[in-house]
């Protein structure tokens, strides 16, 4: 895959140098319509705040079916680990408390996305629980000439795992779930399993992708499965790929199994449990992709003929949200760590535990920026932490940065071609927005 070098040009936009002449960006600047809001800081709603109001929108037509399987981006592959008890990431970068230039930020993001062929993109920036800036670019539905707005919802793919992990950690705090006990027993399953080792897999191992549970895409996109619950149950009948706790392999199946546990313990449907426990207390709204159709207000996306793959991913990658919704969740986790009295979703000890990295496999080339994984969080190696997500025509990222900023960028389209590039785009956009 060709690598991109991102630099800010004299006009404050992104210039792209490709390592291979075989890759290029398509599209024109005509798509870069921008809707933004960064005039005054807005305090994040707490538990008593009303939910975000979505404006009425026209139901977009069905998308042209894709002829390819949806692809999910996995941070890494299987590798033997030596320890999962290292300390959480710490930083010494001073917090940024100066002005934030939303227009400069937008210029960088738009140049890297919709100006090069993406359908739409949205961003949100927060600091210490306050909204600094939100913006949207491009078209929510180009076939209907519907522009994207700050209320447009995007498929957030594996960023969904952060929501699932947060709810699980709440239940660990409450004593309803034991982090280091087998999940099967807590789910009321006593076997027999196709692989007896399944009965020993702990909740922590599911959260950290060290369970050995299969990562096969066939679990989700084969066998005529229609729901994530079916995918999870199907996985229980598979042989583990390694002894639990001895290796790391990123697997969506882990989080579908956690979804089953969440439903069992709370007595609520998974979507309801996430809304009540994670989203509503911080004034965020989102929905789990429920049908083959795109809802009004959702960004247009590619589809796979005859398959509702978002529904099958569920707790692992099925949420649809605005950039601000995603930023609010990450910001609440950060507040729980740095200002426990202001935390609204989990205790500081839980966030600290979520940020303890498991060793990342040695790859060629090595993982970008020394990335590693915790409990439902990606640790980016520079002190930033959050999560990324990539699936058919969708790129998503939310990052809690060492400078105190929380940034989310959600993209519908194929540019950049991976979330590694979005990390660089965020760095450049923040640099432009905070330049003296």
Task: Pin down the residues of each PLM region.
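Residue-level preference for non-acidic, small/hydrophobic
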Residues: 109, 123, 129, 161-164, ...
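Short, surface-exposed loop or secondary-structure junction motifs
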Residues: 134, 141, 194-390, 397
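Hydrophobic (often cysteine-bearing) scaffold residues that line and stabilize catalytic clefts
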Residues: 101, 105, 156, 160, ...
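Catalytic loop of the DD-peptidase/beta-lactamase superfamily, centered on the K-T-G motif
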Residues: 2, 16, 21-27, 93-135, ...
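N-terminal leader/targeting segments and the immediately adjacent pre-domain N-terminus
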Residues: 1-148, 170-177, 208, 264, ...
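Short active-site loop at a secondary-structure junction
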Residues: 116-122, 143-205, 242-251, 314
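A general secondary-structure junction signal
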Residues: 125-127, 187, 291
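Residue-level detector of conserved, well-ordered beta-strand and adjacent loop positions
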Residues: 138, 149, 184, 355, ...
């Amino acid at each position: 895959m060709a690598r991109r070098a991102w630099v800010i040009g004299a006009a404050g936009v992104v210039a792209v140098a490709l390592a291979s002449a075989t890759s290029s960006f398509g599209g024109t600047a005509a798509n870069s319509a921008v809707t933004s809001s960064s005039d005054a800081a807005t305090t994040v709603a707490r538990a008593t705040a009303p939910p975000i109001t979505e404006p009425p929108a026209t139901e977009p037509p069905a998308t042209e079916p894709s002829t390819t399987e949806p692809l999910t981006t996995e941070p890494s592959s299987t590798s033997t680990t030596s320890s999962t008890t290292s300390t959480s990431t710490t930083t010494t970068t001073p917090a940024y408390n100066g002005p934030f230039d939303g227009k400069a930020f937008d210029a960088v993001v738009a140049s890297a996305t919709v100006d090069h062929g993406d359908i739409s993109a949205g961003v949100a920036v927060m600091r210490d629980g306050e909204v600094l800036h939100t913006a949207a670019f491009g078209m929510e539905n180009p076939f209907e000439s519907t522009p994207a707005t700050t209320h447009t919802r995007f498929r957030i793919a594996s960023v969904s795992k952060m929501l699932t992990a947060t709810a699980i950690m709440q239940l660990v705090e409450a004593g309803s779930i034991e982090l280091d006990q087998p999940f099967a027993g807590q789910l009321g399953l006593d076997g027999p399993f196709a692989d007896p080792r399944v009965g020993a897999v702990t909740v922590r191992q599911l959260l950290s992708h060290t369970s050995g549970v299969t990562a096969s895409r066939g679990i989700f996109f084969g066998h005529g499965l229609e729901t994530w619950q079916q995918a999870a149950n199907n996985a229980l009948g598979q042989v583990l790929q390694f002894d639990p706790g001895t290796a790391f392999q990123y697997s969506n199946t882990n989080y579908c199994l956690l979804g089953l546990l969440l439903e069992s313990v709370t007595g609520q449907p998974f979507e309801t449990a996430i809304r009540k426990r994670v989203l509503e207390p911080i004034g965020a709204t989102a929905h789990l992709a429920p049908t083959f159709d795109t809802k009004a207000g959702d960004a247009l996306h590619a589809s796979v003929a005859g398959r509702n793959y978002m529904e099958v991913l569920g707790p692992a990658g099925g949420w649809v949200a605005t950039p601000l919704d995603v930023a609010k969740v990450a910001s609440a986790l950060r507040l729980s760590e740095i200002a426990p009295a202001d935390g609204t979703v989990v205790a500081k000890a839980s966030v600290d535990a979520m940020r303890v990295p498991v060793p990342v496999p040695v790859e060629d080339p090595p993982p970008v920026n020394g990335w590693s994984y915790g409990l439902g969080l990606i640790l980016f190696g520079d002190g930033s932490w959050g999560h990324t997500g990539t699936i058919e025509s969708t790129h998503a990222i939310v990052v809690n940065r060492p400078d105190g900023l929380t940034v989310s960028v959600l993209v519908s389209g194929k540019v950049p071609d991976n979330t590694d590039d979005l990390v660089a785009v965020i760095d450049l956009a923040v640099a432009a927005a905070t330049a003296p």
